[in-house]
Amino acid sequence: MEQTFYQFLMTYRGKLEKDDNSELAEWAFRNHNFPKHSNTYDEISNYLEWNSPFPSATVTFDSLWNEYEWKKAAY
């Protein structure tokens, strides 16, 4: 079964040194409305545009999405 973006994002939780990736992961974990079962860029991107937790969240998401897609292609 294919890993969702949310599952991929959760690998960034719990870092001792916080960065934008871990901040987005912590926010998604605590946000009950985050589209946890989505693998669609547009759905998650639109959600973040309306509910952005910090100013660079959409840029962080784009970077993480590229990594997510790259890892999916590798498997």
From Swiss-Prot:
SUPFAM superfamilies: YozE-like (SSF140652). InterPro entries: UPF0346 (IPR010673), YozE_SAM-like (IPR023089), YozE_SAM-like_sf (IPR036806). Gene3D superfamilies: YozE SAM-like. Disulfide bonds: none annotated. Belongs to the UPF0346 family. This is UPF0346 protein OB1736. It comes from Oceanobacillus iheyensis (strain DSM 14371 / CIP 107618 / JCM 11309 / KCTC 3954 / HTE831).
